[in-house]
């Protein structure tokens, strides 16, 4: 889906890691939420409450998911699932555009 209709956009930005990651929250009529954001090159560790699906729209990063010691390359057009109540680390290699869907 490249376009969202009939949604509410939260005006205030979500700013993490001194501006290295910035997103906006999109709220759908059924109450579900997504964030649309940009990540600058760098290393970032996030924690989750609800399970998430991260879609990488463009850019490239190396990803370490919970319970794994391996780094996996993820690029534009790919996605990955993050379990609830966990943390994951990304080494962002180039400017990365993403969409994060919150499932819980």
Curated annotation (Swiss-Prot):
The protein, known as: Pyrimidine/purine nucleoside phosphorylase
Family that this chain belongs to: Belongs to the nucleoside phosphorylase PpnP family.
InterPro entries assigned to the protein according to its UniProt record, in alphabetical order: Ppnp, RmlC-like_jellyroll, RmlC_Cupin_sf
GO CC terms of this entry: cytosol
Gene: ppnP
Gene Ontology MF: a single term: guanosine phosphorylase activity
Catalytic activity: a purine D-ribonucleoside + phosphate = a purine nucleobase + alpha-D-ribose 1-phosphate; adenosine + phosphate = alpha-D-ribose 1-phosphate + adenine; cytidine + phosphate = cytosine + alpha-D-ribose 1-phosphate; guanosine + phosphate = alpha-D-ribose 1-phosphate + guanine
Annotated EC: 2.4.2.1, 2.4.2.2
HAMAP family xref list: Nucleos_phosphorylase_PpnP
Function text: Catalyzes the phosphorolysis of diverse nucleosides, yielding D-ribose 1-phosphate and the respective free bases. Can use uridine, adenosine, guanosine, cytidine, thymidine, inosine and xanthosine as substrates. Also catalyzes the reverse reactions.
UniProt xrefs under SUPFAM superfamilies: RmlC-like cupins
């Amino acid at each position: 889906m490249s376009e969202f209709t009939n949604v509410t956009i939260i005006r205030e930005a979500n700013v993490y890691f001194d501006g290295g990651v910035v997103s906006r929250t999109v709220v759908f009529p059924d109450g579900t939420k997504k964030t649309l954001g940009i990540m600058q090159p760098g290393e970032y560790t996030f924690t989750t409450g609800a399970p998430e699906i991260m879609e990488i729209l463009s850019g490239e990063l190396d990803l370490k998911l919970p319970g794994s010691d391996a780094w996996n390359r993820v690029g534009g057009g790919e996605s990955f699932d993050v379990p609830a109540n966990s943390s994951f680390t990304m080494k962002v290699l180039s400017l990365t555009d993403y969409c994060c869907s919150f499932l819980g």
